[in-house]
Amino acid sequence: MRFFSYLGLLLAGLVSLQGFSTDNPLEEELRYWCQYVKNCRFCWACQDGLCKNKVLKDMPSVQEHSYPMEHCMIHRQCKYIRDGPIFQAECTMQTCDATHLINA
């Protein structure tokens, strides 16, 4: 019986997940998301064709519209549960693989 109670709570949390896309996170949450999912669109500030990571200042700039930048912007989708203990990133690539592409 306890299992079904836990499962119900988990499913309720997943339903709430649908409304919280990290395309435009709250300012106080930006550091968390840019640290663990470095290549999502909201982590980058682009100007004059170059994109710089908003939080990790020591990361090299990336050309806007380069393969790594376009791939990350189009294909990576990161979501989370705002008021729960579960943080989840749904991405087509693992973060370390995408970081490797950007640093290549």
UniProtKB/Swiss-Prot annotation:
Signal peptide region: 1-31
Keyword Signal: yes
Top-level division of the source organism's lineage: Viruses
One protein family per Pfam: v110
Alphabetical list of InterPro entries matching this protein: ASFV_fam_110
Assigned keywords, A-Z: Early protein, Signal
Induction description: Expressed in the early phase of the viral replicative cycle.
Functional note: Plays a role in virus cell tropism, and may be required for efficient virus replication in macrophages.
Family designation: Belongs to the asfivirus MGF 110 family.
Name of the featured protein: Protein MGF 110-2L
Organism: African swine fever virus (isolate Warthog/Namibia/Wart80/1980) (ASFV)
